[in-house]
From Swiss-Prot:
Residues 144-152 are annotated as: Flexible linker. Gene3D superfamilies: 5' to 3' exonuclease, C-terminal subdomain, DNA helicase RuvA subunit, C-terminal domain, Nucleic acid-binding proteins. Belongs to the RuvA family. This is Holliday junction branch migration complex subunit RuvA. InterPro entries: DNA_helicase_Holl-junc_RuvA_I, NA-bd_OB-fold, RuvA, RuvA_2-like, RuvA_C, RuvA_C_sf. Residues 65-143 are annotated as: Domain II. It comes from Methylorubrum populi (strain ATCC BAA-705 / NCIMB 13946 / BJ001) (Methylobacterium populi). Homotetramer. Forms an RuvA(8)-RuvB(12)-Holliday junction (HJ) complex. HJ DNA is sandwiched between 2 RuvA tetramers; dsDNA enters through RuvA and exits via RuvB. An RuvB hexamer assembles on each DNA strand where it exits the tetramer. Each RuvB hexamer is contacted by two RuvA subunits (via domain III) on 2 adjacent RuvB subunits; this complex drives branch migration. In the full resolvosome a probable DNA-RuvA(4)-RuvB(12)-RuvC(2) complex forms which resolves the HJ. The keyword Electron transport does not apply. Its main location: cytoplasm. One of its GO terms (cellular component) is Holliday junction resolvase complex. Residues 153-208 are annotated as: Domain III. The RuvA-RuvB-RuvC complex processes Holliday junction (HJ) DNA during genetic recombination and DNA repair, while the RuvA-RuvB complex plays an important role in the rescue of blocked DNA replication forks via replication fork reversal (RFR). RuvA specifically binds to HJ cruciform DNA, conferring on it an open structure. The RuvB hexamer acts as an ATP-dependent pump, pulling dsDNA into and through the RuvAB complex. HJ branch migration allows RuvC to scan DNA until it finds its consensus sequence, where it cleaves and resolves the cruciform DNA.
Length: 208
């Protein structure tokens, strides 16, 4: 089995790169995010590889990090998720973002992936929620905050601030993370903060 390839980028296809390794061209399928981060043809790169062997073919999947490869494997443990859908998810969410989205139950972020509808997004979140923190650090405060917003137990200024950031076009998981960071920075002052202040601080966090 091939676990890693290091070579020269030969050319690109719609969803793959041809990597020249000592004169042999390997077709390696990648997420759109990974393809965008690879160098131009003629330059060197390396990829972590997942090898799938079937009776009629051998297919290679490439990743910029071991974490991305682990998520590729984990996503496929959920019914209805094959290699194409797994790559689609990793095309819109990098590993840390995916871990946070699943840990906080942000089905909307997961559903942005091609081939993932609301029902499959809900299944992914439900089945992988307990496993997500093992793949990337997830802020417990963010998880608690997201749960409070969903349960309608979060202070109104907090809920309003998150809603405002979402209305500005930020994904739910990013909006929640920004407000969680703002609240942490306020310390004791978080108990009396107004929504407009949280929005301003949240935008500052998002701009970093």
């Amino acid at each position: 089995m091939i676990g890693k390839l290091k070579g020269i980028v030969d050319s690109y296809g719609e969803d793959f790169v041809i990597l020249d390794v000592n004169g042999v061209g390997y077709v390696v399928h990648c997420s759109a995010r990974t393809l965008q981060r690879l160098p131009k043809p003629g330059e060197a790169t390396d990829l972590a590889i997942e090898t799938h062997v079937r009776e009629d073919m051998i297919r290679l999947y490439g990743f910029r990090s071991d974490a991305e490869r682990e998520w590729f494997r984990l996503l496929q443990t959920v019914q209805g998720v094959g290699t194409r859908v797994a790559l689609g998810v990793l095309s819109v969410l990098e590993p840390a973002q995916l871990a946070t989205a699943i840990a906080t139950g942000d089905k909307g972020a997961v559903a942005r992936a091609p081939g993932v509808g609301p029902r499959l997004a809900a299944r992914l979140v439900a089945e992988l929620k307990d496993k997500a923190p093992a793949f990337a650090p997830v802020d417990p405060a963010l998880v608690a905050l997201t749960g409070a917003v969903e349960d309608r137990t979060a202070p109104q200024p907090v809920a309003d601030a998150i809603s405002a950031l979402v209305n500005l076009g930020y994904p739910q998981v990013q909006a929640s993370a920004a407000i969680a960071a703002a609240l942490k920075g306020l310390g004791d002052g978080a108990e009396t903060v107004e929504a407009k202040t949280l929005i301003r601080l949240g935008l500052r966090e998002l701009a970093r």
